[in-house]
Amino acid sequence: KPNPERFYAPM
């Protein structure tokens, strides 16, 4: 499962 703490969403 993905880690929301390490999640990065580029614009």
Swiss-Prot record:
Subcellular location(s) per record: Secreted
Signal peptide: none
Chief location of this protein within or outside the cell: secreted
GO (cellular component) term, any one: extracellular region
Keyword tags: Amidation, Neuropeptide, Secreted
Keyword Secreted: yes
Methionine amide, modified sites: M11
Disulfide-bonded cysteines: none
Keyword Secreted: yes
Family: Belongs to the tachykinin family.
Biological function: Tachykinins are active peptides which excite neurons, evoke behavioral responses, are potent vasodilators and secretagogues, and contract (directly or indirectly) many smooth muscles.
Protein name (record): Ranatachykinin-D
Organism: Aquarana catesbeiana
